[in-house]
Regions:
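Amphipathic helical "hinge" segments at domain boundaries
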Residues: 55-125
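Structural motif
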Residues: 74, 138-140, 260
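Short gly/ser/thr-rich secondary-structure transition/capping motifs
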Residues: 51-57, 118-122, 140-141, 243, ...
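Bacterial carbohydrate/catabolite-sensing allosteric modules
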Residues: 1-5, 19, 51, 99-109, ...
Length: 366
């Protein structure tokens, strides 16, 4: 194993160029995403990178004992949509990144944030290039295979958020199962809803799979009619949620009495689409989310959801990564608790907050 690592550490961009039969400049353009190299050139470079197990800049950094005091954060960027101005990076991911940044600053670290496109063909190469510039990586969602994570983890420590757990990396997440089960029980037991739908997130997301599995198990145990599957496949975005509902209504499908969305952004799109078709929420269809992003409480009606400690997740991801960088800690996974947040979109009555006497006096209502 040590010999294999030394062999990999000796690799340079020159080896890739030689293996691919292209110039060093061409390899640099492909690896750095610069210019528009020809498709065959890109393919040859990527094949050489794969065959050699090359990690850009990483080996030289791994051989050095110098800590750069920089961690890299990579998230998956959604495709352009009609809701482009509310890309998920502005909601859930932004809050997580804020937690990472605050925790990093306390330790004297800087944060290098980057994104990869959902349909990018060179995700590993892009992430590997970032790995060569930092002391550790935090990856949002599932963007690399277990084999790719293992390869990168030989160069820098890796913590994944809602990603694929591997023996080579650390993971930080929330208790998806408990959150969804409590939500389903609330809808079935407290409201008496007998038909429930699950509008999914990314099909390859471990979080989505955990939530879908918990939903199906709890709804089945309650004897509820279940709506899920291909027709209910979203992508964690408002546009994805809106498109699913619009498609179902256009096809003449009967909507369930309550729709459990994989995240709050999906719920935002669902509520938007239902409002456009004059379907009352929660009077005709109840809608719930997952995350409790800041905007959730300001929707109309306010969104019932499962709150996960989003900013704490980011801070925790940095701390487990920092512990590995600074002290070689072997923490493998951290699961944070969640909380059911009941508002009005599920059908619960609005509970007005009591105003302090000083406020009542100022409004003439005391």
């Amino acid at each position: 194993m040590a010999a294999a690592k030394r062999s990999r550490a000796a690799l340079t961009i020159y080896n890739v160029a030689s293996r691919a039969g292209v110039s060093i400049a061409s390899v640099s353009r492909v690896l750095n995403g610069q210019g528009t190299p020809r498709a065959d050139t890109r393919e040859r470079v990527m094949r050489a990178v794969e065959e050699l197990g090359f990690v850009p800049d990483g080996a030289a950094r791994a051989l050095s004992n110098n800590v750069k005091e920089v961690v890299g954060v990579v998230f998956r960027r959604g495709a352009e949509t009609p809701f482009a101005d509310e890309d998920e990076s502005l909601l859930f991911i932004d809050v997580i990144n804020r937690g990472i940044e605050v925790a990093a600053q306390r330790r004297g670290f800087d944060v290098l944030i980057s994104s990869v496109g959902v349909h990018d063909e060179s995700v590993f190469t892009r992430v590997a290039a970032i790995a060569g510039k930092v002391d550790g990586l935090i990856l949002h969602d599932r963007m690399l295979s277990p084999a790719e994570i293992t390869r990168l983890a030989s160069v820098v420590p890796i913590a994944s958020l809602a990603g694929t757990p591997t023996r080579a990396s650390m993971s930080v997440g929330c208790d998806n199962e408990t959150g969804i089960r409590e939500l389903v029980r609330h809808l079935v037991i407290d409201h008496g809803y007998r038909s429930l739908g699950y509008l999914a997130g990314h099909a390859d997301s471990p979080d989505n799979r955990a939530r879908a599995s918990a939903f199906e198990a709890e709804a089945s145990a309650a004897g509820a009619e279940i709506h899920m599957g291909a027709a209910w496949q979203g992508n964690y975005s408002a546009s994805g949620g809106a498109e699913v509902i619009t498609s179902l209504l256009d096809s003449g499908a009967r909507l369930p009495r309550a729709i459990v969305c994989a995240n709050d952004q999906t719920a935002l799109g669902v509520m938007h689409a239902l409002a456009r078709r004059r379907v009352a929420v929660p009077g005709q269809v109840a809608v719930t989310g997952f995350d409790d992003v800041p905007v959730a409480r300001h929707l109309h009606p306010p969104l019932t959801t499962v709150r996960q400690p989003i900013q704490k997740m980011g801070a925790t991801a940095f701390e487990v990564l920092y512990s590995r960088i600074s002290a070689g800690s072997r923490t493998r996974s951290v699961v944070l608790p969640v909380e059911l947040i009941i508002r009005e979109s599920c059908g619960c009555a609005h509970q007005p907050e009591a105003l302090p006497n000083s406020t009542l006096a100022a409004t003439g209502r005391a």
